[in-house]
UniProtKB/Swiss-Prot annotation:
Cited InterPro entries: PsdUridine_synth_cat_dom_sf, PsdUridine_synth_RsuA/RluA, PsdUridine_synth_RsuA/RluB/E/F, PsdUridine_synth_RsuA/RluB_CS, RsuA_PseudoU_synthase, S4_RNA-bd, S4_RNA-bd_sf
Function as written in the Swiss-Prot or TrEMBL entry: Responsible for synthesis of pseudouridine from uracil-2605 in 23S ribosomal RNA.
MF GO annotations: 23S rRNA pseudouridine(2605) synthase activity; RNA binding
Enzyme class, broadest EC rank: isomerase
Protein name: Ribosomal large subunit pseudouridine synthase B
Organism: Salmonella typhi
Family: Belongs to the pseudouridine synthase RsuA family.
Keyword vocabulary terms for this entry: Isomerase, RNA-binding, rRNA processing
Length: 291
């Protein structure tokens, strides 16, 4: 059965559907020697040859793909980009290496925001989770600086006008603090750029700390260090797939034995420590080079 080219490539982990549509439009993809155009359909067969930038890539039938999802604790200061020309740290630096696929970020967090960021090998899953029409909840813990009264909270719940259209928090709940430094937990069902910060700024309140603590029903895992990752289990992965009307997985690569889990936790801690040392040396070297 034929499928849209971008869907096949997204499912195989070569990018989100939007990313792949862009590279197809740029003429960077060929199918059996012919430059592909947006809207082309392909049937995945053993003889199918798809190239991106001239490089032959691997694609499999849907039934052969195993969808994997990571929960990553993004620290402040990391960029949500695959490569940075200035050599700054990115969210992809610490992720486990893959063969024949790559990690795709489910949305973005700005450089000054920390917390839960999901990654998957399934571009179609990433695309559906990000799409506003799916209305997947994102929850944030927010520390704000400024006077917050009932009128401002009412405006944030009912909606305010931003430069890219109206926006509102689905829920907003006070969670602690005193005076002009207070914490709130807020939820949104879309992921516009800096939306949480811009909503508070629209009522004259500044955000001094922002942490994403939940995506759908997937929470930021307890005990996960900043810069650490953990792979979602079978049930969690299928929960996300069901949330966006994708068929469930029937197999998983997640180890279930306790000793394997302990080994993974130790690997995560070592990777976080090693990456921090490398990043620190890189920053130190940068300062020396700049005098």
């Amino acid at each position: 059965m034929s499928e849209k080219l971008q869907k096949v490539l997204a499912r195989a982990g070569h990018g989100s559907r939007r990313e792949i549509e862009s590279i197809i439009e740029a003429g960077r993809v060929s199918v059996d020697g012919k430059i592909a155009t947006l809207g082309d359909r392909v049937e995945v067969t053993p003889g199918l040859k798809i190239r991106i930038d001239g490089h032959l890539i691997s694609v499999k039938e849907s039934a052969e793909q195993i969808c994997r999802v990571l929960a990553y604790y993004k620290p402040e200061g990391e960029l949500c980009t695959r490569n940075d020309p200035e050599g700054r740290p990115t969210v992809f630096d610490r992720l486990p290496k893959l063969r024949g696929a790559r990690w795709i970020a489910v949305g973005r967090l700005d450089v000054n925001t920390c917390g839960l960021l999901l990654f998957t090998t399934d571009g179609e899953l990433a695309n559906r989770l990000m799409h506003p029409s799916r209305e997947v909840e994102r929850e944030y813990a927010v520390r704000v600086f400024g006077q917050v009264d009932e009128s401002k909270l009412r405006d944030l719940s009912r909606g305010v006008q931003l430069e890219d259209g109206p926006a509102a928090f689905k829920t907003i709940k006070f969670s602690g603090g005193e005076g002009i430094n207070q914490w709130y937990n807020v939820t949104l069902t879309e992921g516009r750029n800096r939306e949480v910060r811009r909503l508070w700024e629209a009522v004259g309140v500044q955000v001094s700390r922002l942490i994403r603590v939940r995506y759908g029903d997937i929470p930021l895992p307890k005990g996960l260090p900043r810069g650490g990752w953990t792979e979602l289990d079978f049930a969690q992965t299928n929960y996300l797939r069901g949330l966006v009307e994708l068929p469930p997985e029937t197999s998983s690569k997640v180890a279930v034995e306790k000793d394997r889990r302990r080994m993974k936790a130790n690997q995560i801690r070592r990777a976080v420590k090693r990456h921090s040392q490398i990043a620190g040396g890189r920053r130190s070297g940068g300062r020396n080079n700049n005098g």
